[in-house]
Amino acid sequence: MTKSELIERLCAEQTHLSAKEIEDAVKDILEHMASTLESGDRIEIRGFGSFSLHYREPRVGRNPKTGDKVELEGKYVPHFKPGKELRERVHIG
């Protein structure tokens, strides 16, 4: 689901709100989440999961076009860990 699809779905379900209000709310939530992670803080949404930063160690990678080895610096990347309720809801089997 894309951000646009999420907004459309919420508009269909929340008819008492304008599409602009819903779009602004979704954008604000995502912006707050991004700025929270940017500052190094963790986000926890009970029953859904948590977002945090994980450090990737420096490593030797490969340029897919040329095959040349490339030194990649260490960096922090966003990480999502689903909560128990979400894992149980999507468990197939």
UniProtKB/Swiss-Prot annotation:
Transcription regulation is among the record's keywords: yes
Molecular function GO labels: DNA binding; structural constituent of chromatin
Any Pfam family hit: Bac_DNA_binding
Keywords of the record: DNA recombination, DNA-binding, Transcription, Transcription regulation, Translation regulation
An example Gene Ontology biological process: regulation of DNA-templated transcription
Superkingdom of the source species: Bacteria
Keyword Ribosomal protein: no
InterPro entries: Hist_DNA-bd, Histone-like_DNA-bd_CS, IHF-like_DNA-bd_dom_sf, IHF_beta
A Gene Ontology term for the protein's cellular component: chromosome
PANTHER family listed in its UniProt record: DNA-BINDING PROTEIN HU (PTHR33175), INTEGRATION HOST FACTOR SUBUNIT BETA (PTHR33175:SF5)
Described purpose of this protein according to its UniProt entry: This protein is one of the two subunits of integration host factor, a specific DNA-binding protein that functions in genetic recombination as well as in transcriptional and translational control.
Family according to the record: Belongs to the bacterial histone-like protein family.
The protein's assembly and partners: Heterodimer of an alpha and a beta chain.
Name of this protein: Integration host factor subunit beta
Lineage, broadest ranks: Bacteria, Pseudomonadati, Pseudomonadota, Gammaproteobacteria, Vibrionales
Name of encoding gene: ihfB
